[in-house]
A protein has these predicted regions:
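Acidic-enriched catalytic cores of C-N bond-cleaving enzymes acting on peptides and small amides
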Residues: 26, 30-34, 201-210, 217-228, ...
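N-terminal Sec-pathway targeting helices
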Residues: 1-13
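An extended, acidic, His-containing surface patch that forms the Zn2+-binding/catalytic region
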Residues: 42, 90-91, 101, 107-109, ...
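Short glycine/proline-enriched loop/turn "hinge" motifs that connect secondary-structure elements
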Residues: 129-130, 171-173, 234-240, 327, ...
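Short, solvent-exposed loop/turn and secondary-structure capping segments
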Residues: 65, 123-128, 190-194, 222-225, ...
Length: 487
């Protein structure tokens, strides 16, 4: 009996081993071979000077308070890109946002939309002394352009404009219409910028072939088992929701506290939420990422990624160990604000907190809110949503001509990169354009290493001069490729 069982066990292990090896062997590369491109004439010095000057404009996301800065930025654009302003149609939308239309020769072709935003987040005054170069100096030093907006997102705005200006100078004329949309309030929701541009295009019955917005980057030294840079394209983004949790009690003197105080009840609710994370699962964008990255990785990683039918629990457990990768697995929840009390010897009659949720595709605002209610399980805790919220995006299909063109363009401008779809865990202005196309891709060819993650919205934001020139060439090549016959 024991011998029979041992024989069966060995046979099962042998069959399993064969299946694993066969699946690794059939785990073929999804990368494309791209032909070399013609070199476009670009003045690096002029382009760097333009971006440097743009960073000096303090276009913080409070347009009413910074109207003069946005006007100055628009004036810089007019001076730096005369052909763009002469040959494209420009419209101001929602006070400070801009929509450029480059009319194509063949109106039967669906247009494409290139997006970026001109506004930036503020700089915490307490951190200014920690910057190596002043945050709004636009300093060019050590091979970098420094300052707020260098990575998010003035480099996109100006790279797109530099690309179009250079193409116009070379007498390029597009077959399909190209829209350039630059928002002025992306960092605070995009309600008066991108949302109004999208509404304007919708009122004109515009149907887009695809949208390319900011988003994921070219990551180096971040993905274990991958030696090459990873160019990740956001094919979906998480939803956004903030909930206010509040508790009201009678208050009173702190020398005679009741069994349940407002602060105690609220902190108990927060502790329960922290102890019950949303369920983990490999969403379609994350599975797609591993399908594209896996064949290019070391053998041990290939075995796991080629056999997710067996190893997905192991992969989920591994990803959950890091905040950066845990966000790919589940809806995340983080307390971000607390408010209670007026002095040390008075029980507050009200305590409140705000929790911010980033909702994974496949879930919804309603389901996430219901999960929070179930975990808190306390009717004395009032739960109210903030007015600005967005559902998770649809997942764009990678088996389309638009994705293939973007994939090809990345390989033409960054030959060493491994291209893969992925999930963007943040939110972008592209969510306002969802009704105009199913093909929305979030990518910017800026190199990001482990030390650069904290620069986004943080200290020492910068972009290398080399990366910035590559951004310009990327957008120019993308426009050229979208105006060749699509297969």
């Amino acid at each position: 009996m024991i011998k029979t069982f041992s024989f069966i066990l060995v046979a099962v292990i042998a069959v399993l081993f064969v299946v694993l090896v066969i699946r690794v062997g059939s785990f073929k590369s999804r990368q494309v071979i791209a032909e070399p491109t013609q070199t476009l004439a670009i003045s690096r010095a002029a382009a760097v000077a333009h971006l440097s000057e743009a960073i000096q404009r303090k276009t913080v996301s409070m347009p009413a308070a910074n109207a003069g800065e946005f006007v100055a930025l628009h004036t810089l654009m007019e001076r730096a890109f005369p052909r763009v302003h002469r040959e494209l149609t420009k419209e101001s939308v929602g006070d400070h946002s801009l929509l450029f239309t480059w009319r194509g020769k063949d109106q039967r072709l669906k247009p494409i939309l290139l997006m970026a935003h001109m506004d930036v987040v503020p700089v915490d005054p307490t951190t200014e002394s920690s910057w190596h170069h002043a945050p709004f100096s636009g300093e060019v030093a050590d091979g970098y352009i420094w300052g707020r907006g260098a990575m998010d997102d003035k480099e996109s705005v100006f790279a797109i404009l530099e690309a179009v200006e250079s193409l116009l100078t070379s007498n390029f004329r597009p077959e399909r219409t190209i829209y350039l949309a630059f928002g002025h309030d992306e960092e605070i929701g995009g309600i008066n910028g991108a949302a109004k541009i999208a509404a304007l295009l919708s009122s004109r019955h515009v149907e887009l072939e695809c949208i390319v917005d900011e988003g994921l980057n070219v990551f180096t030294g971040i993905i274990s088992g991958l030696d090459s840079p990873a160019a990740l394209i956001g094919i979906a983004e998480k939803g956004y929701l903030s909930l206010q949790l509040s508790v009201e009690t009678a208050g009173g003197h702190s020398s005679m506290p009741p069994e349940h105080t407002a602060i105690g009840t609220l902190t108990g609710a927060l502790q329960r939420l922290q102890g019950a994370p949303f369920p983990a699962r490999l969403s379609r964008p994350t599975r797609g990422m591993f399908e594209f990255l896996g064949p290019e990785m070391s053998f041990d990683k290939k075995v796991v990624l080629a056999n997710l039918w067996l190893f997905s629990p192991l992969l989920e457990k591994t990803l959950a160990q890091s905040p950066r990768t845990n966000a790919l697995l589940r809806t995340t929840l983080a307390p971000t604000m607390l408010n209670a009390g007026i002095t040390d010897n008075v029980l507050p009659s009200k305590a409140s907190a705000v929790v911010n949720l980033r909702i994974i595709p496949g879930e919804s605002i309603a389901s996430a809110t219901q999960y929070v209610r179930q975990v808190i399980a306390d009717p004395t805790v009032t739960i109210l949503p903030f007015p600005i919220a967005s559902e998770p995006s649809a997942v764009s299909n990678v088996d389309t001509a638009s994705f293939a063109i973007l994939h090809k363009t990345i390989h033409q401008t960054i030959p060493a990169a491994v291209v893969a779809p992925a999930l963007l865990v943040a939110s972008t202005d592209s969510r306002h354009y969802r009704s105009l196309t199913k093909n929305i891709f979030r990518f910017l060819p800026v190199t990001v290493g482990p030390e650069d993650i904290s620069r986004y919205h943080g200290i020492d934001e910068r972009i290398s001069v080399e990366d910035y020139e590559r951004c310009i060439r990327f957008y120019a090549q993308l426009i050229i490729n979208f105006n060749a016959p699509m297969r």
